[in-house]
């Protein structure tokens, strides 16, 4: 039976429906009811967002709660994005109109700003499109991460790291290979990308070349990824790409209300990143990671704190 793609009129998720008669379909993401009208053909064209702001400072901030998805639901990710947005605008000089925010907050009514797989893919393309020397780009993701079997043979642990969009059960995850191809490889000379990834299994989710890790014992270690396994060229086009992540590829992340005084849930990693940047402007990357680890290890009665690790992942052709 022929099928077509439509978008949920409440949350923007992609739905696969028969191309035949008018019917009502329940969205698996938000459980909203959608009246589906007949199509003149087997497929309808997907919506394309029209982000038309291109400046020297741009950011994509994505926070996903997975509302209604049983045990998958998170509490602090939308707060993480709101905090990161405030930090970039107030303290880093990013124009509000140059920050694209995607959340599944029930107050968000724009279907193109719902964090579906398609919308995240389009947002990443917008982030890098037309970038040039001197540009500062930020990609922040707060949500679920996972690992999938590596089908291309370029992973030492035989697993691809992925981020999970809100419709991942229907549309699948976004692989590290795709993230690298979209926002890392096209990065031009003189441009800089910072990715802050607050999710499980996020250590090498941008597939960058160098991993600089702070061990639990406080030692710094360097690891050059490419010589250990045969990999295609995943370098930038001359720019600098930096990913700061809260987990190794085999670790899980954590939410907690402790860091906000019990007022609201936040991602421990995102909170510690913003707190450190606000209190120690101009610090080195090494000091940033050390300070973040100290903050999280200071969370009272939290078993996650003793396991916390940070990775600084780096790629450059400059």
Segments (PLM) and residue ranges:
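Cysteine endopeptidase catalytic domains of the caspase/legumain-like
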Residues: 2-318
């Amino acid at each position: 039976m022929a099928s077509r793609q439509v978008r949920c009129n409440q949350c923007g998720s992609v739905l696969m429906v028969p191309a035949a008669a008018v019917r009502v379909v329940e969205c698996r993401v938000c459980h909203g009811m959608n009246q589906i009208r007949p199509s003149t053909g087997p497929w309808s064209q997907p919506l394309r967002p029209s982000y038309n702001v291109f400046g020297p400072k741009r950011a994509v901030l994505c926070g996903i709660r997975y509302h209604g998805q049983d045990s998958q639901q998170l509490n602090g990710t939308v707060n993480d994005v709101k905090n990161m947005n405030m930090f970039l605008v107030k303290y880093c000089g990013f124009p509000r109109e140059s920050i694209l925010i995607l959340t599944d907050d029930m107050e968000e009514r724009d279907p193109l700003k719902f964090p579906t797989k398609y919308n995240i893919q389009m947002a990443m393309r917008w982030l890098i499109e037309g970038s040039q020397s001197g540009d500062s780009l930020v990609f922040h993701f707060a949500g679920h991460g996972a690992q999938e079997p590596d089908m291309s043979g370029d992973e030492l642990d035989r697993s691809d790291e992925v981020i999970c969009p809100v419709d991942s059960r229907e549309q699948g995850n976004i692989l590290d290979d795709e993230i690298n191809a979209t926002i890392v490889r096209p990065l031009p000379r003189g441009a800089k990308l910072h990715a802050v990834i607050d999710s499980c299994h996020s250590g090498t989710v941008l597939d960058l070349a160098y991993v600089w890790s702070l061990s639990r014992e406080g030692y710094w270690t360097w690891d050059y990824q490419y010589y250990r396994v045969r990999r295609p060229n995943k370098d930038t086009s001359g720019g600098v790409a930096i990913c700061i992540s809260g987990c190794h590829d085999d670790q899980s992340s954590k939410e907690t209300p402790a860091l906000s005084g019990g007022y609201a849930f936040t991602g421990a990693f995102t909170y510690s990143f913003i707190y450190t940047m606000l209190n120690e402007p101009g610090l080195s990357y090494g000091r940033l990671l050390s300070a973040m680890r100290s903050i999280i290890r200071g969370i009272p009665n939290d078993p996650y704190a003793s396991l916390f690790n940070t990775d600084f992942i780096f790629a450059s052709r400059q």
